[in-house]
Amino acid sequence: MSHQLTFADSEFSSKRRQTRKEIFLSRMEQILPWQNMVEVIEPFYPKAGNGRRPYPLETMLRIHCMQHWYNLSDGAMEDALYEIASMRLFARLSLDSALPDRTTIMNFRHLLEQHQLARQLFKTINRWLAEAGVMMTQGTLVDATIIEAPSSTKNKEQQRDPEMHQTKKGNQWHFGMKAHIGVDAKSGLTHSLVTTAANEHDLNQLGNLLHGEEQFVSADAGYQGAPQREELAEVDVDWLIAERPGKVRTLKQHPRKNKTAINIEYMKASIRAKVEHPFRIIKRQFGFVKARYKGLLKNDNQLAMLFTLANLFRADQMIRQWERSH
């Protein structure tokens, strides 16, 4: 397939001012280890035969990444390839040849879902980051967030997604699923991910979020009682778990007397703060606020891809911070 630019594309690429989208895509172009990612998918990707020749695997992977960065449906991604030159160039496509349609884009996503390849990409990228010395093992921060799912029954099946559930947080009811993550305390990179229905208690998945080499685990008050859990009895770590809000309020009524205890809570909170970074990236930077698909498997595939890309985005942030300070 030709990567030659059309007249319109070349005119676009020679513009002086770079847009925010161009700058972002340029950074992602450099930080993503494309060959490592392609090697994960290649054994499952259709080979050129007698029928219609498939698009290059890396092109489809680049399109898939852009779908997650910009929270685009298959149809919206197809439109973007026609309308936005910077996205077309990033995918190594040109208007002088056919562009992938929404069905082709959807089929690539289904391929990743069918073989759980987003999970494999998550592991591959984390191994690559660990080998690069970015991901450490000393401490793990754990947290969970509720992700809303459409609660309407006005669909083909006339029912809500049976794999999603309702749960109450504070005074509000939520319907959907929950993403549980284990995060490297040093870098803020996500090393573990578990997807469940929203009504799953955070503590139930704690053991699945630990890699086994950490010396301490930090968590909010929702994880109180973790050291007493039978399945965590063999876990030899320092537990830095926040006290319940009511107890903290009581301590603050006598600040002088409880100064040490209050300072310990502040210390726990400062250590724990980095666990919010991955959620902030996927929600605010990538715009992911609601489950797009039906069923936990498809949504787990999307979340695994989102956290893979969030780790690479975070690694890029760390590199740029280092460059500014040197």
UniProtKB/Swiss-Prot annotation:
GO terms for biological process: DNA transposition. Keywords: DNA recombination, DNA-binding, Transposable element, Transposition. One of its GO terms (molecular function) is DNA binding. Coiled coil: none annotated. Disulfide bonds: none annotated. The keyword Electron transport does not apply. InterPro entries: Transpos_IS5, Transposase_11, Transposase_InsH_N. One of its GO terms (cellular component) is cytosol. Involved in the transposition of the insertion sequence IS5. Belongs to the transposase 11 family. This is Transposase InsH for insertion sequence element IS5H. It comes from Escherichia coli (strain K12).
